[in-house]
Amino acid sequence: MASSQSDSPPLFDLPVRPDFTIEWKIMREGLAPVAGLDEAGRGPLAGPVVAAAVVLDPDRIPEGLDDSKRLTAEARERLVQEIFEVAAAVSVASLCAASIDESNILKASLEAMRRALDGLCVRPAYALADGRDIPPGLPCPCRAVVKGDQRSQSIAAASMVAKVVRDRMMVRTGTLMPHYGFHSHVGYATERHREAITAYGPVTRLHRMSFSPFKTSGEEDRILASGDAAELIASAFSAADGLNGRDAEKEPV
């Protein structure tokens, strides 16, 4: 099994913006290329968790890479398009609400990261994963980097790709279920989303029934997604699976 380690430097050491310092240190030890791993969608009540793996070209790093949460939606879209165009490799993977319910959100997030790394069209010699936990079963050594999307440009790029892809998936799903408002909250527990759940009930294959308020409310009824709605949910949630860098350059999702 590949060796792994957890990296938790002091928070006051955070750079103004993520840079390539960690990657260069690893590459100088003869471990190249380096992949960044991150996920989006751990907190929402609905939808998949999406992970991305990105191998940046050190000579073509997009300007303005940052923690995706610090950027506007327009800035994220622009940067993600550039990442798909200039990165050495990009891969995206997702796990649906049912998979999250079967295990838990942490295990599902780590599994999505593992699948994203496996989907890269190049074999990384090392990986950097955002957070405190390392995905099990990786084919290369990995370091967990706390606040990694604020420290490492590779992780920041993966964070942005995962966020944009997941948002697009939820917006596409919401086109057939406009009363839930997925186009605006993309599954998070906003007041509008909670009101829609109260009014219409949770949606099978979409809402995470192991999450509050479902687990604590004793809610048994679900809307069964059928016909076009079921097909859209299935296609939207699988749209990112198996995406690799060369395919992604033309159309991110």
Swiss-Prot record:
Q: Does the keyword ATP-binding apply?
A: no
Query: Which residues of this UniProt protein bind a divalent metal cation?
Result: D38, E39, D130
What is the predominant subcellular site recorded for this chain? cytoplasm
Task: List GO BP terms, alphabetically.
Answer: DNA replication, removal of RNA primer; mismatch repair
Q: Which Pfam families match?
A: RNase_HII
Classify the source by domain of life: Bacteria
Carries keyword Cytoplasm?
yes
Tell me the protein's name. Answer: Ribonuclease HII
Q: Which gene encodes it?
A: rnhB
Q: What catalytic activity does the UniProt entry give for this protein?
A: Endonucleolytic cleavage to 5'-phosphomonoester
What InterPro entries is this protein classified in?
A: RNase_HII, RNase_HII/HIII, RNase_HII/HIII_dom, RNaseH-like_sf, RNaseH_sf
